[in-house]
Regions:
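Charged/polar low-complexity intrinsically disordered segments
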Residues: 6, 17-18, 27-28
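Compositionally biased low-complexity segments enriched in histidine and/or tyrosine
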Residues: 11-17
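Compositionally biased regions
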Residues: 10, 22-25
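Charge-dense, helix-prone N-terminal extensions
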Residues: 28-157
Length: 157
């Protein structure tokens, strides 16, 4: 999946040029991740802390179920949704409650990402434009950050 990070960074650069804004490259800091079963993992807490550090975003809890939205401050558009749900809702076998991240994604990436482990058609969102990612360590923290950055850029206007 090294190619994924390169493709996302290229897309972020293209969108930044369109909007005349600069996006700094992603910092790859291994100290900001938890480790589970020997794998680096970004969980809900680390994701929300990273979003606050990177964008100054405080999570919004519009429902009383613990699910939260990350919004742009200026236009209030969502760029990410973090929720707990039964893995069956993602089309998986099993009955576990899992943390899931929804992000807006570029059409060029979304189809190929859904063929990779940890990626799913977006739950409760437009499946053509949004993607669900399980926060269970299957998807690397760097890929998650890249996709949140892309989603942030795609929802800017």
């Amino acid at each position: 999946m090294v190619c994924l990070i390169e493709r996302v960074n290229l897309l972020i650069g293209a969108y930044a040029q369109k909007t005349d804004s600069a996006i700094s490259p992603i910092r790859k800091n291994p100290n900001d991740m938890t480790e589970r079963n020997g794998r680096r993992k970004m969980d809900r807490t680390e994701l929300l802390e990273w979003a606050k550090e990177t964008y100054g975003t405080e999570p919004d809890y519009p429902w009383n179920d613990g699910n939260c939205v990350l919004r742009h401050e200026n236009n209030h558009k969502w760029y990410a949704l973090v929720m707990k749900l039964n893995e069956k809702k993602l089309g998986r076998q099993g009955d576990r409650i899992v943390d899931v991240l929804n992000v807006k994604c570029d059409l060029l990436l979304i189809g190929s990402l859904r063929t990779q482990p940890g990626y799913f058609p977006a739950y409760h969102m437009n499946k053509d434009r949004w993607l669900s990612i399980m926060l269970d360590g299957t998807v690397s923290p760097d890929e998650i950050k890249d996709l949140v950055k892309l989603s942030h850029q795609l929802t800017k206007k």
